[in-house]
Amino acid sequence: MMLAIDIGNSSIVTGVYDENDQLAFIFRIATTHDKTSDEYAMLLHSFFEQKGCRFNDVTGVIIASVVPTIMHRFRRMCQDYLHVTPLIVGPGIRTGLSIHYQDPKEVGADRIANAVAAIARYGAPCIVVDIGTATTFCCIDAKHRYRGGVIAPGAAISTAALSNKASKLPKIELTKPASVVGKTTVASMESGTFYGHIAMIDGVVERIKEEQRLDDAKVIATGGLAYLYAEESKQIQHLEQELTLSGLKYIYDKNQ
């Protein structure tokens, strides 16, 4: 079995691929900075037991992380408990992409994985919209060149900032409102957050296509909140909730 681990700012997603290269199951835990490598090992061991599998049967691991301290703990866990040196997505790893970024090391490992999976599944050119803690856009042209991207505040961050800075505005849940025009403060905030974020997504994608001359680019959405926005978007064509894990599997295979 092989583990694909995506360490994000809000959650850590672990995909388990079986001997037939199929995604067998997924574990999700909240991203916290107080767990040790031993605690992560115990958590995964428990998850495997619940699925009737053996944690020690894992023979390969790949990690994409935007949280370096937690990545180091997972690497230690793999070495101590699985006796495996994990593949870390970063400089020197074969991805099939040409990174056209001023400093290629600045491109997040999760964004690279998303781009690899999007090309494999839908071809290039393509634009990947990852809707999570931040909402990011990745632009890949027909020659598999990663041209760059856009990073915007996520919907949850924007809503939290609004509540924190405006004393009379309450905290709200991210949800699709019943109508665009709200009749209460909460309904108005829900509408502004939901439709405002969709308008931002569609507007940015449209501008990317125009500026980069990628009118035929496929637009793929992923991320923890993608399900909430993809259906209402006029630009998003495909929803791939586990795009990052798929990309990690492709990258792992390229490096064997």
Curated annotation (Swiss-Prot):
Substrate binds at Y101, G108, A109, D110, R111, T185. Keywords: ATP-binding, Coenzyme A biosynthesis, Cytoplasm, Kinase, Metal-binding, Nucleotide-binding, Potassium, Transferase. Gene3D superfamilies: 3.30.420.40. A monovalent cation. Ammonium or potassium. One of its GO terms (cellular component) is cytoplasm. One of its GO terms (biological process) is coenzyme A biosynthetic process. ATP binds at D6, I7, G8, N9, S10, S11, I12, V13, T133. The keyword Transferase applies. GO terms for molecular function: ATP binding; metal ion binding; pantothenate kinase activity. Its cofactor is NH4(+); K(+). Its main location: cytoplasm. The active site is at D110. CDD domains: ASKHA_NBD_PanK-III. This is Type III pantothenate kinase. It comes from Shouchella clausii (strain KSM-K16).
